[in-house]
Amino acid sequence: MARLLALVIGYALSSFVLKLFTVLGVGIFTYVGLTALVDGFLNLLQPMLTGLPSYILDILAIAGVPEALSIVGSALLTRASINSAKAFVGVLT
């Protein structure tokens, strides 16, 4: 009985560890890919904003636009990583 219990626990743990490493790998891969995409978008946006007059840039800075862009980019990356991990595990269909 103890041997059977040890086999069942060993199988469950090995399956869990394998799935955990798989999900972490998919999450990291997705995060790295999307980070490059969002950084590329923000790098394209930056030259467009630097061509604006200084008083408009000051108003945008006071309004918190640079921080808002950073927050939105981070939220997109976080949500995409979570969704890809869930889809790979099978939680999302």
From Swiss-Prot:
Its main location: virion. Signal peptide: none annotated. GO terms for biological process: symbiont entry into host cell. It is a multi-pass membrane protein. Pfam families: DUF2523. InterPro entries: DUF2523. It comes from the Viruses. Keywords: Host membrane, Membrane, Transmembrane, Transmembrane helix, Viral penetration into host cytoplasm, Viral penetration into host cytoplasm via pilus retraction, Virion, Virus entry into host cell. It is found in: Virion; Host membrane. The chain crosses the membrane at residues 25-45, 56-76. GO terms for cellular component: host cell membrane; membrane; virion component. Interacts with G3P; this interaction is required for proper integration of G3P and G6P into the virion. Belongs to the inovirus G6P protein family. Plays essential roles both in the entry of the viral genome into the bacterial host and in budding process. The formation of the G3P-G6P complex termed adsorption complex is essential for correct termination of filamentous phage assembly. This is Head virion protein G6P. It comes from Pseudomonas phage Pf3 (Bacteriophage Pf3). The gene is VI.
